Amino acid sequence: MEHLPEQYRQLFPTLQTHTMLASCSQSALAEPVSRAIQDYYDSLLYKGTNWKEAIEKTEFARNEFAKLIGAEPDEVAIVPSVSDALVSVASSLTAFGKKHVVYTDMDFPAVPHVWQAHSDYTVSVIPSIDGVLPLEQYETHISDETVLTCVPHVHYRDGYVQDIKAIAEISQRKGSLLFVDAYQSAGHIPIDVKEWGVDMLAAGTRKYLLGIPGVAFLYVRKELADALKPKASAWFGRESGFDGAYAKVARRFQTGTPAFISVYAAAAALSLLNHIGVSHIRDHVKTICADAVQYAAEKGLQLAAAQGGIQPGMVAIRDERASETAGLLKKKKVICAPRENVIRLAPHFYNTKEEMRHAIDEIAAKTIHK
């Protein structure tokens, strides 16, 4: 699908005044998503109650996310956040009789926070080597005593993409379950949980999924679900809502009433993404990022990209005062996402090559003259 930005930019009013390149943190808000949020308000303001409509919207969002990742709807749970998803997963593993968990030093900090709170597990960290995680590291650190391996699909700091299918093969061979944090990939990199052999995968909606905070999705492979008994479960995770039996498949990981306003937003956002097609989005983002990498190098900027990434969807530029630089850019209506000592430019399907170059020009002007 050619000319993606031209087709869809009018859906994003912010683009008329701002250069929005922070999809790794918060994407631009699309008018269909804004209308969905307003629909939620209006349903309460003018109808007084909206329970049936909200439940229908929840199921629609579940179906759209399942379509996005190649899953069945019953394999998807609606949860408040990726952190909540992992907390629930961590509480569900007792039946496996193993107490060793591994995660990587590229995981978002919420992942180690969860496992630090579970003193009954022995935890190991898989270290990266020169900014990459070779498959040999997984071979070394996953053992037959490992109950769960946690990995990010995309590194939040520099956009490094991992080969999840290859990691899944290693974890399965060693008898470990695999949990994938897809918050930084869902919406701009195609995901196929069945083809990859993933056991569990979670993603929130405020980044590349075009939504707002308050809702996330947890995929659980249906053949696995019955063996998982989450202690973090409540009435939305029960078969009827009012008895003690776990719901079938992934729904058992649900807790209370979801944030319906965020569900409305997610339903509209996911529908838009599925209409466009993530493979088209991937191709567009990859093209403009490749141009931006070359342009940044020409401008004398130092890139933080790791060697060996599969398909770049982010341009990370080194800057020891990244937050300060990002603040200066914000004054010029260029919105990017600083993290530690890098400035992240994270485009989406609505961005152009010219916007990426404009942001790089502004970064070069700020960093070179500091």
UniProtKB/Swiss-Prot annotation:
Cofactor(s) recorded in Swiss-Prot or TrEMBL: pyridoxal 5'-phosphate
Source organism superkingdom: Bacteria
Keyword Secreted: no
InterPro entries from the UniProt entry: Aminotrans_V_dom, Aminotrans_V_PyrdxlP_BS, PyrdxlP-dep_Trfase, PyrdxlP-dep_Trfase_major, PyrdxlP-dep_Trfase_small
Pfam families: Aminotran_5 (PF00266)
The keyword Cytoplasm belongs to this UniProt entry's keyword annotation: no
Keyword field: Aminotransferase, Pyridoxal phosphate, Transferase
Entry's EC annotation: 2.6.1.-
One function term, GO molecular function aspect: transaminase activity
Listed Gene3D superfamilies: Aspartate Aminotransferase, domain 1, Type I PLP-dependent aspartate aminotransferase-like (Major domain)
EC top class, as a word: transferase
Residue numbers of N6-(pyridoxal phosphate)lysine PTMs: K207
Family: Belongs to the class-V pyridoxal-phosphate-dependent aminotransferase family.
Listed name of the protein: Uncharacterized aminotransferase YcbU
The organism of origin for this protein: Bacillus subtilis (strain 168)
Gene from which this protein is expressed: ycbU
